[in-house]
Each structure stands twice: as C-alpha cells, then as structure tokens.
UniProtKB/Swiss-Prot annotation:
It comes from the Bacteria. InterPro entries: CysI, NiRdtase/SiRdtase_haem-b_fer, Nit/Sulf_reduc_fer-like_dom_sf, NO2/SO3_Rdtase_4Fe4S_dom, NO2/SO3_Rdtase_4Fe4S_prot, NO2/SO3_Rdtase_4Fe4S_sf, NO2/SO3_Rdtase_FeS/sirohaem_BS. The gene is cysI. This is Sulfite reductase [NADPH] hemoprotein beta-component. Keywords: 4Fe-4S, Amino-acid biosynthesis, Cysteine biosynthesis, Heme, Iron, Iron-sulfur, Metal-binding, NADP, Oxidoreductase. GO terms for biological process: cysteine biosynthetic process; hydrogen sulfide biosynthetic process; sulfate assimilation. Binds 1 siroheme per subunit. Pfam families: NIR_SIR (PF01077), NIR_SIR_ferr (PF03460). Transmembrane segments: none annotated.
Amino acid sequence: MVNTNNHISEELDKNLDEMEFLKANSDFLRGTIEQSLANPITGSITQDDAKLLKFHGSYMQDDRDLRDERRKQKLEPAYSFMIRVRVPGGKATPEQWIAMDDISNQYANHTIKLTTRQAFQFHGILKRNLKQSMKNINHAVLDSIAACGDVNRNTMCNPNPYQSQVHKEINDYATRISNHLLPRTNAYHEIWLDGEKVLDSSEEKEPIYGNTYLPRKFKIGIAVPPSNDIDVYSQDIGLIAIVEQDELIGFNVTIGGGMGMTHGITETYPQLGRLIGFIPKEKVVDVCEKILTIQRDYGNRENRKNARFKYTVDRLGETWVTEELNRRLGWEIKAPRDFEFEHNGDRLGWIEGINNWNFTLFIQNGRVKDTEDYLLKTALREIAEIHTGDFRLSPNQNLVIANVSPEKKEEIQAIIDKYKLTDGKNYTGLRRNSMACVAFPTCGLAMAESERYLPSLITKIEDLLDESGLKEEEITIRMTGCPNGCARPALAEIAFIGKAPGKYNMYLGGSFKGERLNKIYKENIDENEILESLRPLLLRYSKERLDGEHFGDFVIRDGVIAKVHDGRDFHS
C-alpha cells in the first residue's frame, strides 16, 4: 500500500489540490491574514487568507439578500464574518454564556446559533470587529481554534454529563481528545491575541498534523447508548460508550462516517461509520490520534471532493485500516461489545440527575434570538445570571440547563414560566425532531433556504399529520440548503437538500435511531410537490404501520423506497 502523505516531503506533488500548496506555504496557517485585516479599503480579505481563516474558526461571508442590489450600485458585497466557537462536548459555564451573549450584541447580528456540533456560532461580524471578537471569546476561556478547517473539529458527546458519573467522564474524554488534537502552531495567538511572535517559524512543529494538516475536515463524537443524539455513525471516528454496572469500561469504535456529497457527482455520497472493535477507555486519546494519522497519511490530497476519511476507508477497506491501526498502536483492538440505540433525539424537559436537575429547552433550529412574541435570548441571559450549574449545547440544536440544584430549580422554573420557554412538548413530534442548517442569507454554499424556511414548511406538513392522526408521532425531519450535510440530513426519516431557490431533493427512509441512510425519493421539487408527495404516504403510514413502527422503517417495508445498506449504493 502506497503512503500518499506529503506532509513531511520537501516538495509537493504537482498533482495535489491547490489547497495543499496553500497550507504548505502558509507559514503554519499565518498566510497574510494580519495584512488582510489591516487593509482599510475593503471589508473582505484575500481569497487565500479566507481559506486559511477557516483553521482559525472563521468564515468570510456576505449578505446574499443584498448581493444583487449592491451589484447594481457598483458596491462590493456586504462582507461579514462568521465565528464558530470550539466547545468540546457543548459544555459552557453561565459566565461564558453571558460573554457569548455580549459578543452577539456588540459585534454580531444579535443572535447566537447553536450548531449541530455543539458549538456557538456568530454571524454578521464586520472585519474591523473580528479581532476584538476573538479576544473577547478568549477572555471567556473559550476559543475558535480548529472549529473549521482541515483538522479535527469540535469533539461531540452526549450533552447531559450530570445525569451520572459516566456522563461526566464522557465529557472529560471529549475535552481531552479535542485538546490533544489541536494544531500546535502559534499563529492563532499571534494574530488574534497579540501573542509573542515566533521569530523563525521554520522551527515550529506540528507533531500530529505536519505542515499540510489533514486532506479534509475530521469529526469525532462520543455516544452514550441508548441515546444516539450525536449521530455517531456520521462521524469520522465514532465512539460508543460501553457501560457495565454503572461504570464506563471503554468504547466501541466506528470509522469512516460522513454526510457531505456533491450534486451530480455520484462518486461522492454520505456514508455510515463502520464498527471495527472495542478499546479500553484509557486508550481512547491515542486510538483517535492513530486513526487520524492514517487519514493524514493515506487520505486523498488530489481531489478534495473525495478527500474525507469515508472515501479512504472505502478505497483501502475497513480490514486494512483496522490492521494498520493495530500496527500503529502496537496492540490489537478487541471485538466490539453489545449495545443498542433507541433514538437520536433529545430528552426534553426536566430530567433528574444525581442530587440535581437538568432542563432541556427546545430551540427551533438552534437560533437564540428575541422576537416580538418570544424573548428567548433575554430569558436565557436572566437564567445565566442566577444559574450555578452549566449549559450544554445539544447535537440537535437544543440547550440543556444542566446541574440545577434543587434550591435553584424553582427560581429557574419561574423564568421559564415568565418567558413561556418551551420544552417542545406543546409542539408536534415532527417539529421536536427537526433540524436545519443556516443557509441563506449568510452561507456562501447555500442553493436554497433552510433555517428560514423549514419551520413554515413543517407547519404545512402538520396539517397533513393532523389529517392522518399523527401529530404526536416522533418523526425526524431535516433540511439543508446544499448537499454538504451540516444538519446530517442523510440520516433523517424525511430530508430535504436544496438544489435551487425553492427546489429540493426529497429523501426518505432514514432510521429513527440514526443507524441507516435515507435515499432519494423525488428530485428538484417545490413546496406543492413536497406536500402532494407526503400526504398519501402519511395517510398510508397512519393506517398500515405495525405496532411501534417508525416512519422511516415503514416506507422501506412498504416498498416506497429501497433500503440503503452502504453509502456506495446511495445513488443507485
């Protein structure tokens, strides 16, 4: 097997993707970002610096609602920046919540986006405010290092670690993995925090990544059965906690999951992680590093559309990857242990923990904002000002007010009542299990609406559910504005992926447990066609389903859609 890694080579192969040259020549991710930030003539930075900026946790964007008008006025696009804050396991203190709230009000668009990877996200930050925003994030003892880019992204885990000692231990492992796999370059501290500059960066080392980092982004998540809330099979490395007699003994490991694809290119597809074995818990950080280095060394650096670890595993085979992992570890991973998932959603409302309480708040599509009739942002700040526990950002874009002492429970409940905050139980099962990415107006990749549209589409689907007697039925529905898969649509029972404004591909047949990919049902359809397609299916499901049968299972059993056994069959 040929090692295709070039991160230690003095000269790069001319066939490599241009991003490989950019990384290699970036002076360990510095580029000319400082000079771009200092340029007062434009609200943008150079395209090369915009690519490197992702490693620092920020994307350059523009307001796509204003593009045409500004073009007519011969103005440059309305540039702004998104910052994604790294929050391993989604854990934040009340003080950190208040700091994030302040940043959103001072520098962003007065909203906070809770992402599907348990991170904070700010939109609408102007170039002149970017550095101060980064500093303020750092003052809150958070950062945006490696929240984006060709590195390990925010490490996920079950968001309610105070339910038991096991959950707390899981969160600690998520933090250890995240910190261990951070880039070691000093560039972030130099550019954003006025840190002491490295006089000769040629002396700098990236002991894990090398100077070209990974071929593409890399994602790790930890699930605690029976909850698959992190969608463990969507991760490059999935870790499934194995608990015996209330003690965490280790993890089952899956490799090569991923959601993204490109419309029209069948060589790209979503894929489920493959279960390869069991490891003791004390070995988990080393195992994650060794798997990541296999992708570093053998991942495709010539074609970024096929550069994710899922394609490496598919190309080399999971048996070969497992044997190579064993070789690098110097010991063999064991056979996987038994486990079972029940769902991939959140447990909403109050949940009693060990000497404390946790309240999971339903936040539609993760957007924390105040509206005329729902002062969510104000309410959460009031809670943060009195809360003595933690906040936990959920993989389903909800928020856990965690570790609430019995003495504080009544006080927090009073704020919940005052602002009419919801645990989602007044909503349909469909809305409670919905997710959408940001899409328009800020995401440069969006082909169609998502976050701004899904709630109103659900309202219309709810009329069909009412007609079918299914309003309380738990059904997962997800929407993205492009096929990159940020809301993990390929795992949903019903999914919509944007093709053009107002047009979507419709997918059916994912598993309620997050264990099966869905498949395309109809292509390039509008809202009327969506509703016309769903009505007979929901009516039939209502009348013909088996006891306890979920919608995704029904459409496969009924022959509406073929079952997908492997991502390589996704388009067939």
